[in-house]
Structures are given as structure tokens and as C-alpha cells.
A protein has these predicted regions:
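C-terminal all-alpha effector/ligand-binding and dimerization domain
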Residues: 2, 16, 128, 174, ...
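Short linear motifs at protein or domain termini
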Residues: 1-110, 227-230
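Short helix-coil transition/hinge motifs at the ends and kinks of transmembrane helices
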Residues: 9-11, 132-142
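Amphipathic coiled-coil alpha-helices
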Residues: 100, 123-126, 130, 141-144, ...
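Amphipathic alpha-helical dimerization/coiled-coil segments
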Residues: 100-132
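Hydrophobic, amphipathic alpha-helical faces that serve as interaction scaffolds
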Residues: 96-112, 150-186, 225
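Short loop-to-helix capping motifs
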Residues: 45, 161-163, 206-207
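Hydrophobic packing residues in well-ordered alpha-helices of helical domains and bundles
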Residues: 93, 120, 145, 149, ...
């Protein structure tokens, strides 16, 4: 009879406070992404605690996580606020993306295996078949398209095999997505479908130079479209 060693204990179930913090975090994140809180608006822990029926400690824990996502700023007086909409902020985010994402993409092209290729192809297929706008959501990108768009870009980067770099990608993506959702489609002459097709084609052809060139151009056009109107 084969003997086995002692099994590792299961992780403890989430406590009530942890569950509440998760719920408040998810609510805050969704509310900010929907635009329920205007750019620059204060996120007052006392008000949020009263609205959600939870303690200040739970709200503060959730707010710290939202700050980590790039969806809120922590102010010098220890308050919190939604990031203010400014050209400088979004151009800084765009510069960071243009610096980091081409490196990740090149690593993916060089390291990605056949499973990575399949994920990229599937993500691009989903994106290409998802309408960017719906009558219900007007001139803003639809939730379904926004998620398909994120999954495609994430799939392109996943072949890099570096979870730390992917965490950086996720944070920058969330911050730029917030800016994009606050803006409308300001470049109607842009052919995003073709840009994504060229990205997929170059990546799967293992042409790192072309893939990164297309990506930089893609990110530059996105940054130009997110420039705040005067």
C-alpha cells in the first residue's frame, strides 16, 4: 500500500471583512469605470461607508486597492479622488505603454508557444466579431467590445512569460481604459479593425520588428484620440 505524506491544509475561507472589502472594491471599480464618479471627484470614505452599509476600515481597504489599479489617487491629506482628466496624465500613461508594451510583445513573439498562438487567434476572432457600439450605449464603446479588446491585447502579451511585466500591463491598461471610457470615438477616420488584424498577422508570423512597429503606431493613435478637448 502506497503511503502519502500529509496534505497541505486548505486556505482559510474568506472572513466577513474580506468578503465585504471584495464587494465594496468591485462596486467602486465598476462605478468609476461606468463614470458614476466624475473625473477629479472626491471619494469620501465616510460617504461610501454609509452608502454601502460597511465600516470605514472596509472602505479604506477597498480604496487602497482601487488606487493600486490606477482608478483613484491618494491625496496628500490622506483623502481619495478619481483621477482628474488631463492631457498630461493620459500622455504620461501613453508614454509608459509605448515603452513597456513593445518589449512585452517582442518577448511574446520570441517565446510564445503554439498555445499562445491559439489564444491570440481566438482573441482576435472574438474582437473582430464584436460590434464596438450598441444602440443602448450610444457613442461610447460597448462593454462587450471593451472586454474583447482587452483580451486581445492581453493575449498578445501573455507569451512573454513574465507575470511581473503582465501585472504592469494590466495596471496601465486599466488606467488608459478609464480615460478612453471618458472620451468618445474622436478619430472616426481610424481603421481599428485593420490595425488589430496587422497586429495579429505580424505576431503570429513571428515578425517582432513589424509587430512592435504596428503596436507603437496603434498606441500613438490611441493616445491622440484620448487628448482632452479644450
Amino acid at each position: 500500500m502506497t503511503q502519502t505524506g500529509p496534505t497541505s491544509p486548505l486556505p482559510p475561507p474568506p472572513t466577513g471583512k474580506r468578503m465585504l472589502s471584495e464587494q465594496v472594491y468591485a462596486h467602486l471599480r465598476d462605478a468609476i469605470m461606468r463614470g458614476d464618479h466624475a473625473p477629479g471627484a472626491a471619494l469620501k470614505p465616510q460617504d461610501l461607508a454609509r452608502e454601502q452599509g460597511v465600516s470605514l476600515a472596509v472602505v479604506r481597504e477597498a480604496l487602497v486597492r482601487v488606487v493600486g489599479d490606477g482608478l483613484a489617487d491618494r491625496l496628500p491629506n490622506r483623502g481619495f479622488a478619481v483621477p482628474a482628466y488631463s492631457d498630461r496624465r493620459w500622455q504620461e500613461i501613453a508614454e509608459a505603454r509605448r515603452t513597456i508594451e513593445p518589449v512585452l510583445l517582442r518577448m511574446s513573439v520570441e517565446r510564445g508557444d503554439v498555445d499562445w498562438e491559439a489564444r491570440v487567434r481566438a482573441a482576435h476572432h472574438r474582437l473582430s466579431r464584436t460590434p464596438p457600439y450598441t444602440p443602448e450605449e450610444g457613442e461610447y464603446y460597448s462593454e462587450a467590445w471593451s472586454e474583447a479588446h482587452r483580451l486581445f491585447h492581453r493575449a498578445l502579451m501573455e507569451g512573454c512569460g513574465n507575470p511581473v511585466l503582465l501585472e504592469t500591463f494590466d495596471r496601465l491598461w486599466t488606467a488608459s481604459e478609464l480615460a478612453r471610457r471618458w472620451s468618445t470615438h474622436r478619430n472616426p477616420g481610424r481603421d481599428g479593425v485593420e490595425e488589430h488584424r496587422r497586429l495579429e498577422e505580424a505576431a503570429l508570423a513571428r515578425d517582432a520588428d513589424t509587430a512592435t512597429e504596428v503596436l507603437v503606431r496603434h498606441l500613438t493613435l490611441t493616445a491622440e484620440g484620448l487628448t482632452a478637448q479644450g
